């Protein structure tokens, strides 16, 4: 969720071509991780999104809202515009999915086809959460392409959010995972691998693995490989490689902070990540993780070029387009398949 200046965006304005980043990547991309509302549930709208996609060479986009909204507390004179703007809490906000669905429906049919919307506006610790998913699919049967981004363990945001701590293996999510399997829908999860103060081992990774192992028919996408602000562990690429080798139903997206911190630090691709990407390119996609601010899509995606340039043609095509299209593109307008009763293992 970029809300700060990333050093790979810095350009020497005196050089020719300094406006090139505004045009996005030289490779056409499916942006597989794009929030179209902010933390106060405001959106620039569908026309602004399509315009920005065209300017940034984004052919299609996987879009979703935000499942939480920032409270404007009585003691705060200035309205917050981000979850870190002040110390006020966040609360779950189900209407975010309606905002996304109506944004899509407001566009011409040809532009709607470029968008793969996901549903995310449920409380992941509420065992009634499945009902929200079912209602939204029934209300907008021609819209959804998957579920997510489900915000689970998320450093400061976890502390700000009302209620029980969300986690990938919470019992409230198991019926949703089963629903996703029955309808062949991918599930995008934000699950930090560890806490801010535990950077020597992945404290929370077992929660993700338990869910992924319990639902082998559900396709999970591990958002930005489990990294967040101040969240890191040694040998990160080895951990990701082990996960992809062990769980064939697990995918990852390269987005937000992981790219600049470990994949391509200081704008120099790490050879270990290049090798991992070549090996598992069919399970990796790229995303901006922008929270609205569509005008920044170009620079955000442009910075991937230095990494993409060093991949084989096949791996590059998978990251830029094929993996995301395989995950999300085949599900559009197919959400009304018959649902099988969800009976997770822990209830049998």
What are the functions of these language-model segments?
Residues 6, 13, 108, 154, ...:
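Catalytic pocket-lining loop regions of alpha/beta-barrel enzymes
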Residues 17-21, 47-55, 129-142, 175-179, ...:
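Short amphipathic alpha-helices and their capping/turn segments at secondary-structure boundaries
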Residues 1-32, 41, 45-60, 64, ...:
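Mid-to-C-terminal alpha-helical segments outside catalytic/metal-binding sites
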Residues 37-45, 69-72, 90-96, 122-130, ...:
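Acidic-and-aromatic substrate-binding clefts and catalytic sites of carbohydrate-active enzymes
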Residues 30-34, 60-63, 115-120, 145-149, ...:
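Hydrophobic faces of well-ordered beta-strands that scaffold small-molecule active sites
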Residues 4-22, 77-195:
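Active-site gating/metal-coordination segments in enzymes
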Residues 46-47, 86-104, 129-133, 169-173, ...:
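Well-ordered, non-membrane alpha-helical segments in soluble/globular domains
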Residues 34-107:
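N-terminal carbohydrate-binding/catalytic regions of secreted carbohydrate-active enzymes
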């Amino acid at each position: 969720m970029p809300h700060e200046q990333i050093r790979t965006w810095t350009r020497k304005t005196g050089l020719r071509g300094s406006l090139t980043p505004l045009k996005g990547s030289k490779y056409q991309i499916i942006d597989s991780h794009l929030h179209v509302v902010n933390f106060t549930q405001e959106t620039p709208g569908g026309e602004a999104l399509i315009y920005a996609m065209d300017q940034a060479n984004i052919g299609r986009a996987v879009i979703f809202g935000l499942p939480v909204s920032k409270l404007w507390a009585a003691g705060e004179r200035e309205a917050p515009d981000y979850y870190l703007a002040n110390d006020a809490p966040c609360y779950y906000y189900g209407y975010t999915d309606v905002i996304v669905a109506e944004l899509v429906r407001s566009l011409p049919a040809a532009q709607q086809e470029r968008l793969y919307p996901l549903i995310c506006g449920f409380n992941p610790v509420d065992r009634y959460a499945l009902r929200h998913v079912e209602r939204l699919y029934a209300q907008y049967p021609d819209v959804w392409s998957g579920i997510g981004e489900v915000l689970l363990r998320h450093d400061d945001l976890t502390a700000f959010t009302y209620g029980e701590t969300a986690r990938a293996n919470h019992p409230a999510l198991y019926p949703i995972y089963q629903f996703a399997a029955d309808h062949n829908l991918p599930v995008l999860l934000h699950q930090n691998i560890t806490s801010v103060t535990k950077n020597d081992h992945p404290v929370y990774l077992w929660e993700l693995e338990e869910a992924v192992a319990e639902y082998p028919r559900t396709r999970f996408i591990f958002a930005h490989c489990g990294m967040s602000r101040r969240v890191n562990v040694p040998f990160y690429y080895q951990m990701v490689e082990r996960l992809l080798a062990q769980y064939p139903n697990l995918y990852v997206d390269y987005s937000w902070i992981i790219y600049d911190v470990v994949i391509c630090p200081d704008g120099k691709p790490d050879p270990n990540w290049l090798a991992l990407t070549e090996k598992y390119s069919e399970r990796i996609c790229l995303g901006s993780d922008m929270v609205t601010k569509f005008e920044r899509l170009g620079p955000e995606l442009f910075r991937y070029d230095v990494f993409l340039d060093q991949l084989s043609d096949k791996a590059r095509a998978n990251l830029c387009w094929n993996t995301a299209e395989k995950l999300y593109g085949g599900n559009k307008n197919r959400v009304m398949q018959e649902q099988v009763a969800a009976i997770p293992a822990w209830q049998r």
